[in-house]
Amino acid sequence: MKPSIVLYKNIPADLRERLEQHFTVHAFDGLTPDNHDELRQALQQAEGIIGSGGKIDEAFLQQTPKLRAASTISVGYDNFDVDALNAHNVLLMHTPTVLTETVADTIMSLVLATARRVVEVAERVKAGEWQGSIGADWFGVDVHHKTIGILGMGRIGLALAQRAHFGFGMPVLYNARRTHEEAEQRFNARRCDLDTLLAESDFICITLPLTDETFHMISRDQLAKMKKSGILINAGRGPVVDEAALIEALQNGTIHAAGLDVFEKEPLPVSSPLLTLPNVVALPHIGSATHETRYGMAECAVDNLIAALTGTVKENCVNPQLLKK
């Protein structure tokens, strides 16, 4: 008899067929076990779950007594209580290798859009304001040969450094827990403390995950240390930045602009002051949102779940210590 799994996000038909070759698949639109009897029953029998979003914590795990593996269609896993998963001997799989280049492209697009005011001036054209030669009030600032500061030098940070160095001739600073030899050798990147990075960078790009250490890592004091001409880009996790402090800094000119793909609350409330500021480019968390990459992420998550439930895990496991038990 095939193991039972719960699929809680729509995936391409061919990938669902692959799951069905290995498992009995119960498909749902999201995870709401408290409100959905059929889902609750499926979770009682599920040995694996696969999807994205939803809060997977102790309360959830109490409803999944047979669960052996969870496969998230994402690189981030801050919605999972890893300690609770460990206590229940549940493997957590994610997709860190698939989306690197696409997210780096998104970050670079935010750098360009904020510097050259692409969204703002495009809207002015659509509004009929382009009536002759443009003046200084339409101008942006250069990107090439400006200094980029990268918070977090993982896969995405490295891919961003490559684009900045080779594509735009930008000096690269980075802040990370350890020296990244490849970044320093290939891109002449310089590791520095956070205060130095804030003070010297023209563009500060956040690629960090959300942890206890990174929560509100950028707040009022840190924003005050940036150049007044500085631009903040966040494509890591929203709560890494104190959003209220950022709004204040953008309103009073402490920093020049911000490009944001992530927010403290998502979707971003329509009442957010960020949506009223012309010096903000706000995207709906589209860092990995291309057809090719989203397919690749789903494919990787399917492979991960199959590996986890057949005892063939070689990569992409958040809690590999469980494999030794």
Curated annotation (Swiss-Prot):
It catalyses: glycolate + NADP(+) = glyoxylate + NADPH + H(+); (R)-glycerate + NAD(+) = 3-hydroxypyruvate + NADH + H(+); (R)-glycerate + NADP(+) = 3-hydroxypyruvate + NADPH + H(+). Its EC number is 1.1.1.79, 1.1.1.81. The keyword Repressor does not apply. Gene3D superfamilies: NAD(P)-binding Rossmann-like Domain (3.40.50.720). Its main location: cytoplasm. GO terms for cellular component: cytosol; plasma membrane. It is an enzyme of class 1 (oxidoreductase). It is found in: Cytoplasm. InterPro entries: D-isomer_2-hydroxyacid_DH, D-isomer_2_OHA_DH_cat_dom, D-isomer_DH_CS, D-isomer_DH_NAD-bd, Glyo/OHPyrv_Rdtase_B, NAD(P)-bd_dom_sf. The active site is at R237, E266, H285 (proton donor). Keywords: Cytoplasm, NAD, NADP, Oxidoreductase. It comes from the Bacteria. One of its GO terms (molecular function) is glyoxylate reductase (NADPH) activity. Belongs to the D-isomer specific 2-hydroxyacid dehydrogenase family. GhrB subfamily. Catalyzes the NADPH-dependent reduction of glyoxylate and hydroxypyruvate into glycolate and glycerate, respectively. NCBIfam families: PRK15409.1. Homodimer. This is Glyoxylate/hydroxypyruvate reductase B. It comes from Serratia proteamaculans (strain 568).
